[in-house]
């Protein structure tokens, strides 16, 4: 069954609820920097909560922000918007945010992982909301400066004040998202669909599809450079067309030979067996099994990721890719 979603636009949303309120953005990475700058440019009073020893402290000060420790920022804020990595959040929340929360404050997130999987359990006397731009932070900022915005999701997990949705929408407008459109969802749906999309398609699936296509071409005797162009480099051109025009628009833009070959062979390569595998690993997310596995590695996450990344870094496609990027002027 297809569910109808509510979409909110600029002319439907007011930022009045943010007047005289202070938003403390916790973290100054990709999303933290972009959202903090966009909200400030929209007239919101934004402060930052950071680690004094962190590299971002001086950078944020240089960018003109009031910067405090996380504890002090929490005390000063009406909305505490937590934009640090998922596995770091629970410890920071427990030690530096939770002890200083007061009645009527709001906790904000841009991903529902820790709320949905109960790694953070907020007190009942605060609002808990989500404002999740559907683009990397750099793009969130770029599009805002161009006068538009990227689409975003909002959700309410806990509405203590009775104004949680109004607050989430106002924050979405402040980062520019209502210029494009804001979809109302739930913490559960955002978290699970985000993880499933990353694993099956955007990160896991795409890397493996390109890598295996490259390997087949090389194993058949084609030069690695040629294989890279066909399996990887041109993937961006196709994705740009899909992004701008959809599948049908992309197909209209490629040759008839590409159309026929793609439409007849594609479903045989990415067949029902692949879909069954996708469903299997989607269920791991839905059951909480993936979250349990990832959370169990919290203390050694850097080491685990370094080992996994090493396998990719040493693959021939990466060596060839660096050569092609230098040819294209993308790397020095």
UniProtKB/Swiss-Prot annotation:
Its gene is: ilvC
Catalysed reaction(s) here are: (2R)-2,3-dihydroxy-3-methylbutanoate + NADP(+) = (2S)-2-acetolactate + NADPH + H(+); (2R,3R)-2,3-dihydroxy-3-methylpentanoate + NADP(+) = (S)-2-ethyl-2-hydroxy-3-oxobutanoate + NADPH + H(+)
Taking every annotated instance into account, which residue ranges of this chain make up the domain KARI N-terminal Rossmann? 5-185
Origin superkingdom: Archaea
Q: Which residues bind Mg(2+) 2?
A: 194, 230, 234
Question: Which residues are the signal sequence here?
Answer: none
- Which residues make up the binding site for Mg(2+) 1? 194, 198
Q: Which family does it belong to?
A: Belongs to the ketol-acid reductoisomerase family.
Any one biological process term the GO annotation gives: isoleucine biosynthetic process
Task: Return the InterPro entries for the record.
Answer: 6-PGluconate_DH-like_C_sf, KARI, KARI_C, KARI_N, KARI_prok, NAD(P)-bd_dom_sf
The family database entries (HAMAP family) matched by this protein are listed as: IlvC
The GO molecular function terms of this record are: ketol-acid reductoisomerase activity; magnesium ion binding; NADP binding
Which NCBIfam families does UniProt cross-reference here?
ilvC, PRK05479.1
What does the entry list as the binding residues for NADP(+)? Answer: 28-31, 51, 56, 86-89, 137
Its job: Involved in the biosynthesis of branched-chain amino acids (BCAA). Catalyzes an alkyl-migration followed by a ketol-acid reduction of (S)-2-acetolactate (S2AL) to yield (R)-2,3-dihydroxy-isovalerate. In the isomerase reaction, S2AL is rearranged via a Mg-dependent methyl migration to produce 3-hydroxy-3-methyl-2-ketobutyrate (HMKB). In the reductase reaction, this 2-ketoacid undergoes a metal-dependent reduction by NADPH to yield (R)-2,3-dihydroxy-isovalerate.
Quote the protein name from its UniProt record. Ketol-acid reductoisomerase (NADP(+))
Pathway listed: Amino-acid biosynthesis; L-isoleucine biosynthesis; L-isoleucine from 2-oxobutanoate: step 2/4; Amino-acid biosynthesis; L-valine biosynthesis; L-valine from pyruvate: step 2/4
Catalytic residues (positions)? 111
Q: Which cofactor does it need?
A: Mg(2+)
| UniProtKB keywords | Amino-acid biosynthesis, Branched-chain amino acid biosynthesis, Magnesium, Metal-binding, NADP, Oxidoreductase
Q: How is the cofactor bound?
A: Binds 2 magnesium ions per subunit.
* Domain called KARI C-terminal knotted: residue spans: 186-331
Q: Which organism is it from?
A: Pyrococcus furiosus (strain ATCC 43587 / DSM 3638 / JCM 8422 / Vc1)
Q: What is its EC number?
A: 1.1.1.86
- Indicate which residues the UniProt annotation says bind substrate: 255
């Amino acid at each position: 069954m297809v569910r109808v979603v509510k979409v909110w636009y600029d002319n439907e949303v007011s930022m009045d609820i943010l007047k005289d309120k202070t938003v403390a953005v916790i973290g100054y990475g990709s999303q933290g920097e972009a959202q903090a700058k966009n909200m400030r440019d929209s007239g919101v009073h934004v402060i930052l909560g950071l680690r004094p020893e962190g590299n971002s402290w001086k950078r944020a000060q240089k960018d003109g922000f009031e910067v405090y420790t996380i504890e002090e920022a929490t005390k000063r804020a009406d909305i505490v918007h937590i934009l640090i990595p998922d596995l770091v959040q629970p410890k920071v929340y427990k030690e530096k945010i939770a002890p200083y929360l007061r009645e009527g404050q709001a906790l904000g997130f841009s991903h529902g992982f820790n709320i949905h999987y109960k790694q953070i359990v907020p007190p009942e006397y605060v609002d808990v909301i989500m404002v999740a731009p559907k683009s990397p932070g750099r793009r969130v900022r770029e599009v805002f400066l161009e006068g538009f915005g990227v689409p975003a999701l909002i959700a309410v997990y806990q509405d203590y004040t009775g104004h949680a949705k109004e607050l989430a929408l106002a924050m979405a407008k402040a980062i520019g998202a209502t210029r494009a459109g804001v979809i109302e969802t739930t913490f559960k749906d955002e978290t699970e669909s985000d993880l499933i999309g990353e694993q099956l398609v955007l990160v896991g699936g795409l890397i493996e599809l390109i890598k295996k296509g490259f390997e087949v071409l090389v194993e058949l005797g084609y030069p690695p450079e040629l294989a890279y162009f066909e399996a990887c480099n041109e993937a961006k051109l196709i994705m740009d067309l899909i992004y701008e025009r959809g599948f049908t628009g992309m197909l209209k833009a490629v040759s008839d030979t590409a159309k026929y070959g793609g439409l007849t062979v594609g479903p045989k390569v990415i067949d029902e067996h692949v879909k069954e595998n996708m469903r299997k690993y989607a269920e791991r997310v839905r059951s909480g099994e993936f979250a349990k596995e990832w959370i169990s590695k919290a203390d050694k996450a850097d080491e685990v990721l370094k080992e996994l990344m090493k396998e990719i870094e040493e693959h021939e496609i990466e060596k060839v890719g660096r050569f092609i990027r230098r040819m294209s002027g993308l790397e020095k």
